[in-house]
C-alpha cells in the first residue's frame, strides 16, 4: 500500500522541483556587464532593438548573438568577429572605430554574452 502512494508523491515532487528550477532570477550584472548595457543602450539599441514590424529585421536583434555558432552574416559568433564588425563596420553597419576604447568594447561584449538580460531587482 505504501508503494502505491510513493510513486504519485515522487512524481508530484519531481514536477514541482522542475517547475521551480526554471524560476530562478537573473543574477546581478557585473560592473563590466552594466557598463556594456549602458553602452548598448546609448550606441546600439536604437538600431538593434526588437520591434513588432513584420519585415525582416535589419539590422538584426542582438539578444542571442552568442547563442548561435554564427552571426546573422554567417561569420563565426566569436568575440573577435563581433569586435571586428563593430569597429570596422559590415554591410549597412557603420564603423564604430574610435568610438569605443578597448575597455568599452570588452564591456559591450560582456553584456552581449548575457543575452541582453536585465539585472535582478
Which residue ranges define each predicted feature?
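Electrostatic cytochrome c docking/interface patches
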Residues: 22-39
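The canonical Cys-X-X-Cys-His
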Residues: 36-50, 108, 112
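Cys/His/Pro-rich metal-binding microdomains
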Residues: 45, 63, 94
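Processing junctions and N-termini across compartments
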Residues: 17, 38-41, 87
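Sec-dependent bacterial lipoprotein signal peptides
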Residues: 1-23
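Gly/Gly-Pro-rich "capping" loops immediately C-terminal to redox-active cysteine motifs
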Residues: 33-37, 49-84
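C-terminal capping alpha-helices of c-type cytochrome domains
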Residues: 86, 92, 97-121
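Inter-heme linker and motif-flanking segments adjacent to c-type heme-binding CXXCH motifs
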Residues: 24-29, 51-55, 72, 114-121
